[in-house]
Amino acid sequence: MSLPQWCPPHSTLKRNPTTGEDVYCICKRPDYGELMVGCDGCDDWFHFTCLHIPEQFKDLVFSFYCPYCQAGITGKNKDAIINGEGSLPKTLWKRKCRISDCYKPCLQDSKYCSEEHGREFVNDIWSRLKTDEDRAVVKKMVEQTGHIDKFKKFGQLDFIDNNIVVKTDDEKEIFDQIVVRDMTLKTLEDDLQEVQEISLPLFKKKLELLEVYLGWLDNVYTEMRKLDDDAASHVECGKEDSKGTKRKKKKNSSRSRARKNICGYCSTYERIPCSVEEFVRDFGSNEEATKIHEVCTKWKCNRHLDWVSTNQEQYLQQIDSLESMQERLQHLIQARKKQLNIQYYEEILRRGL
């Protein structure tokens, strides 16, 4: 597939050599706040105006591929495409609401973006029915479907979304050729499997292990404070004046002591370093050490500042991103299967099977 006439040849330029600004799109200009869309193939960003896409279509983009990816010049699967092992990707659009001047995507299992627009469309059709006979036909259709949701789907081909049941060898040959050997579907399913079985469980496990380690660290802090309080009480009780009477404690002497916790960072927090008792004992015997059992024991550590919140936020963001990717891949697989099912049934009809 060749590039559109309005699209310049591909350039690998990512930064303006004069200004040092990052550049994007086919125009290789910086981001000045214009409406842009991200390519799912090469991860670059493109201006709607440069791609000749009306801005009102911004909510209808489901999966976008730039002209270079659609031509096989860039993208994750460009090598497979060059070797003839894959098909060129295409931009997928969400179904537009049936109201002519509305550019919002349809709700699931609906032809409208909202119930209000559904009622508006039906009311418009009803107002155009000129005779009682026309209204009687519509009334009969509603009565036959029995439910408003079924009426909304009246005339749709639900079998297109269902798995194909192959009955003959000829049908199997067509099914294998169109569906089984489709590299786009295989790539999407492989990506989904990797997200579900490798990436997502990995980061969930990392977050779980971090929480376990933080629980261990809290127990360490608790035991260290207990020892600190016991030591302070022992010192106060041992202070007696020359008459053999105990001195009065200074007001709020124990409370005025700053409560500090050690840094607690450990590069191998996926496993608990040792028991709480062992760590507290070893720390008590060597309070000058800056690391015990690979745990940073500095009282004020700038190197590992906010390491807990940083790691937690990183893992939560990764999990959220992967869950969004999982949902998106599931939708893409569903859409691709529907495309292939249509191709399969068209070929069945063409061959007269």
UniProtKB/Swiss-Prot annotation:
Looking up InterPro entries in the UniProt record yields: Spp1/CFP1 (IPR037869), Zinc_finger_PHD-type_CS (IPR019786), Znf_FYVE_PHD (IPR011011), Znf_PHD (IPR001965), Znf_PHD-finger (IPR019787), Znf_RING/FYVE/PHD (IPR013083)
Annotated residues that bind Zn(2+) 2 are located at 39, 42, 66, 69
Basic residues biased stretches = 245-255
What is any one of the record's Gene Ontology cellular component terms? Set1C/COMPASS complex
Q: Does the keyword GTP-binding apply?
A: no
Output compositional bias ranges, type Basic and acidic residues. 235-244
In terms of superkingdom, the source organism counts as: Eukaryota
Biological processes per GO annotation:
positive regulation of DNA-templated transcription; regulation of DNA-templated transcription; regulation of meiotic DNA double-strand break formation; subtelomeric heterochromatin formation
Q: Where is the signal peptide?
A: none
CDD domains, per this entry?
PHD_SPP1
Region of interest called Disordered, as start-end residue ranges on this chain? 235-255
Residues bound to Zn(2+) 1 are: 25, 27, 47, 50
Phosphoserine modification sites are 87
Residue numbers binding Zn(2+) 3: 97, 102, 113, 117
Where is region (Non coventional C3H-type zinc finger) located?
A: 83-124
Q: Which SUPFAM superfamilies match?
A: FYVE/PHD zinc finger (SSF57903)
Record localization: Nucleus
- Where mainly located? nucleus
Q: Per its record, what are the GO molecular function terms?
A: chromatin binding; methylated histone binding; zinc ion binding
Describe the protein's quaternary organization and the partners it interacts with: Component of the Set1C/COMPASS complex which consists of SET1(2), BRE2(2), SPP1(2), SDC1(1), SHG1(1), SWD1(1), SWD2(1), and SWD3(1).
Task: Read off the domain note.
Answer: The PHD finger is responsible for methylated H3K4 recognition. The C3H-type zinc finger is distinctly different from CCCH-type zinc fingers in both the amino acid sequence and the overall structure. Most CCCH motifs contain the C-X(7-9)-C-X(4-6)-C-X(3-4)-H sequence, while SPP11 employs the C-X(4)-C-X(10)-C-X(3)-H sequence to coordinate a zinc ion. The C3H-type zinc finger is necessary to ensure the overall structural stability.
Free-text function comment from the UniProt entry: Component of the Set1C/COMPASS complex that specifically mono-, di- and trimethylates histone H3 to form H3K4me1/2/3, which subsequently plays a role in telomere length maintenance and transcription elongation regulation. COMPASS recognizes ubiquitinated H2B on one face of the nucleosome which stimulates the methylation of H3 on the opposing face. SPP1/CPS40 can recognize methylated histone lysine residue H3K4me3 or unmethylated H3K4. Stimulates the RNA binding activity of SET1.
Additional detail: Present with 1680 molecules/cell in log phase SD medium.
Full protein name = COMPASS component SPP1
Q: What is the source species?
A: Saccharomyces cerevisiae (strain ATCC 204508 / S288c) (Baker's yeast)
Ranked from the top, the taxonomy reads:
Eukaryota, Fungi, Dikarya, Ascomycota, Saccharomycotina
